[in-house]
């Protein structure tokens, strides 16, 4: 045995024993580096590092840190022929560095398939490279494990190898196959614990890299598995994460695969497969797995996340799969299932990446085999069947030549983005269509989009149980469904401003009474305009079989001027009709109407009674008076609320039984209504004459003219509107009453008042271009009421008051137009309400008087939750 010291800062005490046929070898007391044959097991084969042959059972125990560094073109470790068993009880570290040839870390083979050789090891680490060129064997080759008809058991495995050379550069992390002269042979490789495999092939005219390659009835079992491969070729590059052929079987738990193929030659190709099962093989992966496949180059690049073909089967737990390429000439199939194969996937994601405007981009591509009944089996893709796992699919789904795709999306986090086509890209006169069955349930969504290549959807059966479909894309999309089942869900179709849209068609009279709520994206009610426009839109977009029990209602979101449209539909395969049409007032128009009402109501609220304006005029001693008052309050009308501050001051002079006066006033208020706000202001001049007759009679006549302004902002789903305008307000009021004494102090004053108010019309345009023309609005208000009070000698009085008021109304039309769309609304403030309050008049000094009251209006559409008024009058 020859050995060389491994350079180490801290030598370790260890023992290496080679036990073969019961004979022990000498102890080694420090970590060793082995560069030649390790003798003892089978010294006749010096080209191998360690080799066993027929009938031998050998056990190797290496010291910690021992490494076998191998530069020979033969395997570093070989199990050869029948009945052999090679055991490693401590970590096995192999470092390969071979020039101009082919090599393997571990090679196992036999000439008798009934009793294959065996290898048992733990913590196996294989690293290295094969470089240079060899045109005699036409390749540079390296494999971590290369086995034919052997039984291998390893606990924890790490492989990191590179093939770098010409003409062909080939790297297999694990290759397992057999000789072809025994059709019944089986062989198994089992790795417990974790297996980490990296294989890189580069610089050859042809490059092949595979993490695992299984041929000819090979069987492999793994726990947690991680694979990374990369093939970089001057011409043709091929890479596989796992490749299984010839009735092979591979099982793994949680698995993570990352593969990449690169070929810069525009006349050559690059092929990348995450999983590739063909020729009656089976691959099974556990939950929480990931597969990422990527290709790049200037030629015809193909990327496949998972392929299963020729009567093979792939079973995936919850797995996230992504396939992408970076070539303008490239194609992507995240899942590619063909020729009588089956793919079952419990859940996860199936996504493709369109990095360079790929010609085709398929999340699922299923193509069946010849339907000849003598040997045909179905090609089937099953996603989330019988489970409730999240599923996310990005890319088109195709089924051709009687292939079957079953998609079950039944969680609110599940979605598919792409088109579904069961005619398939290969269908011609010699082919048949496939079958796609889709279930959308529990808020799962389908975004039908044509940007990945197809441009329409055609499927056999849609089961809709509280799922949603969105047909939104710049390109018009069509969906054809043979059978619609389930309880129903949501459908959104995109249309352009000319009401061009794709269609949703159900071709058969299914008995399920699916209730489908249909809405339209890309347009609003302003585009549709009226019921006739809605009828045309529905006929073009919904084509439901006449005898279908499904029920479709439609909705168009509101525009600026036209409100939300709703209707039921009547099924007809050539285009549904509509019934029970409802067109609401838009948020914007409704808010403009309420802002206009706020102006009118604020003007009406300024109309005051005599006592509110002047207090008790009879208490004054002089023939002239100056007065001021402040009023603050809040009113509500039809869910609009206004808070305002009103200030007024005036002067009057007595002439016989009359007091003639004038006043100026300023009102400032803020109105809120939903998402709309407004500032209401007025500046007014008032002229009045008040008659104080004998026996408590009085009359009060008031004329007022004011400048009114309204500045409003409206936030609506369709957008923001700002408007402002100014107009004139006029009013005339006449009040009559009589104070009737009820003893020394008490009194009762019945009152009647009639007012006429007018707000002039106005034309203006909002900031976003809505042209508005308001008619003038007039209103007549009658009031009947009383005061019941008590005098405080010569110092004033206190009182309670109550009234009933009625606005006789008077409608005013407002016309609005925007981008060729117009609408009209009418405002009529007719109403009956009640007012009640308390107040006082108090002589402050010989020639000054304080008066105040609080009141509340209730019982009608118009309400004032609170209002107070306070004033001061000086006489001289």
Where are these regions (language model features)?
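Solvent-exposed, glycine/polar-rich loop segments of beta-barrel outer-membrane systems
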Residues: 591-594, 643, 670, 674-676, ...
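Extracellular beta-strand/beta-solenoid scaffold signature
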Residues: 39-53, 69-81, 95-117, 127-149, ...
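Outer-envelope beta-barrel architecture signal
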Residues: 414, 622-626, 645, 656-660, ...
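Outer membrane beta-barrel transmembrane domains
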Residues: 686-691, 773-876
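Outer-membrane translocation/initiation segment of Type V secreted surface proteins
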Residues: 32-33, 487-507, 514-652
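Gram-negative bacterial Sec-dependent N-terminal signal peptides
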Residues: 1-31
């Amino acid at each position: 045995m020859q050995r060389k010291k491994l350079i180490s800062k801290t030598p370790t005490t260890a023992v290496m024993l080679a036990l073969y046929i019961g004979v022990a070898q000498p102890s080694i007391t420090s970590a060793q580096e082995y560069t030649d044959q390790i003798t003892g097991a089978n010294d006749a084969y010096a080209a191998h590092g360690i080799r066993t042959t027929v009938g031998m059972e050998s056990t190797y125990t290496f010291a910690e840190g021992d490494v076998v560094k191998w530069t020979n073109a033969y395997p570093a470790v070989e199990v050869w022929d029948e009945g052999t068993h090679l055991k490693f009880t401590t970590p096995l570290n192999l470092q390969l560095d071979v020039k101009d040839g082919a090599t393997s870390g571990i090679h196992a083979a036999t000439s008798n398939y009934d009793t294959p050789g065996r290898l048992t090891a733990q913590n196996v680490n294989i690293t290295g490279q094969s470089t240079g060129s060899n045109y005699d064997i036409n390749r540079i080759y390296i494999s971590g494990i290369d086995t034919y008809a052997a039984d291998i058991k390893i606990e924890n495995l790490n492989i990191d190898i590179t093939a770098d050379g010409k003409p062909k550069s080939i790297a297999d992390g694990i290759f397992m196959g057999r000789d072809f002269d025994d059709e019944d042979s089986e062989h198994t490789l089992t790795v417990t614990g974790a297996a980490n495999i990296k294989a890189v092939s580069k610089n050859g005219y042809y490059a092949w890299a595979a993490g695992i390659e299984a041929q000819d009835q090979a069987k492999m079992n793994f726990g947690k598995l991680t694979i990374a491969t990369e093939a970089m070729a001057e011409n043709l590059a091929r890479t596989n994460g796992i490749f299984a052929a010839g009735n092979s079987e591979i099982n793994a738990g949680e698995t993570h695969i990352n593969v990449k193929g690169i070929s810069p030659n525009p006349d050559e190709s690059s092929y990348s497969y995450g999983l590739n099962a063909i020729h009656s093989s089976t691959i099974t992966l556990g939950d929480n797995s990931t597969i990422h496949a990527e290709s790049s180059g200037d030629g015809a690049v193909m990327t496949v996340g998972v392929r299963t073909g020729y009567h093979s089967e792939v079973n995936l737990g919850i797995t996230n799969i992504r396939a992408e390429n970076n070539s303008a000439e490239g194609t992507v199939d995240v899942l590619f299932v063909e020729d009588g194969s089956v793919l079952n996937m419990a859940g996860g994601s199936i996504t493709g990446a369109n990095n360079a405007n790929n010609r085709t981009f398929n999340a699922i591509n299923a193509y069946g085999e010849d339907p000849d009944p003598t040997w045909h089996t179905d090609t089937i893709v099953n996603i989330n069947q019988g489970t409730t796992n999240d599923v996310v699919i990005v890319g088109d789904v195709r089924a051709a030549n009687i292939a079957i795709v079953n998609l079950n999306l039944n969680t609110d986090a599940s979605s598919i983005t792409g088109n579904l086509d069961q005619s398939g890209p290969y269908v011609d006169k010699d082919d048949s269509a496939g079958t796609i069955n889709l279930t959308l349930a529990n808020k799962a969504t389908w975004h039908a989009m044509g940007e990945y290549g197809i441009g329409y959807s055609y499927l056999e059966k849609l089961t809709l149980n509280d799922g949603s479909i969105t047909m939104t894309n710049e390109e018009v999309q069509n969906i054809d469904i043979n059978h619609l089942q389930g309880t129903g869900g949501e459908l959104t179709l995109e249309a352009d401003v000319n009401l061009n849209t794709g269609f949703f068609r159900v071709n058969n009279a299914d008995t399920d009474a699916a209730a489908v709520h249909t809405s339209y994206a890309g347009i609003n009610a302003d585009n549709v305009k009226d019921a006739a426009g809605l009828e045309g839109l529905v006929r073009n977009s919904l084509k439901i079989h006449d005898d279908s029990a499904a029920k479709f209602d439609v909705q168009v979101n509101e525009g600026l001027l036209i409100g939300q449209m709703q209707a039921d539909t009547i099924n007809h395969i050539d285009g549904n009709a509509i019934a029970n049409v409802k067109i609401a007032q838009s948020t914007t128009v409704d808010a403009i109407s309420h802002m206009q009402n706020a102006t009118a109501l604020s003007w009406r609220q300024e109309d005051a009674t005599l006592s509110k304006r002047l207090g008790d005029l009879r208490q004054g001693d002089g023939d002239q008076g100056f007065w001021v008052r402040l009023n603050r309050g809040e009113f509500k009308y039809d869910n609009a609320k206004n808070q305002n501050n009103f200030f007024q001051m005036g002067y009057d002079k007595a002439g016989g039984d009359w007091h003639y006066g004038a006043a100026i006033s300023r009102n400032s208020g803020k109105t809120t209504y939903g998402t709309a706000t407004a500032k209401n202001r007025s500046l007014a001049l008032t002229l009045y004459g008040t008659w104080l007759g004998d026996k408590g009679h009085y009359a009060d006549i008031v004329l007022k003219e004011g400048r009114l302004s309204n500045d409003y902002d409206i936030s609506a789903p369709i957008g923001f509107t700002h408007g402002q305008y100014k107009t004139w307000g006029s009013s005339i009021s006449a009040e009559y009453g009589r104070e009737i004494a009820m003893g020394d102090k008490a009194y009762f004053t019945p009152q009647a008042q009639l007012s006429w108010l007018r707000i002039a019309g106005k034309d203006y345009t909002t900031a976003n271009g809505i042209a508005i023309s308001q008619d003038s609005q007039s209103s007549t208000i009658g009031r009947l009421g009383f005061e019941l009070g008590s005098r405080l000698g010569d110092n004033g009085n206190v009182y309670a008051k109550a009234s009933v008021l009625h606005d006789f109304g008077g409608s005013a039309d407002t016309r609005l137009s925007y981008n060729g769309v117009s609408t009209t609304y009418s405002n009529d403030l007719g109403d009956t309400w009640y007012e009640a309050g308390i107040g006082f008049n108090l002589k402050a000094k010989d020639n000054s008087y304080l008066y105040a009251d609080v009141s509340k209006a209730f019982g009608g559409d118009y309400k004032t939750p609170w209002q107070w008024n306070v004033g001061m009058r000086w006489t001289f």
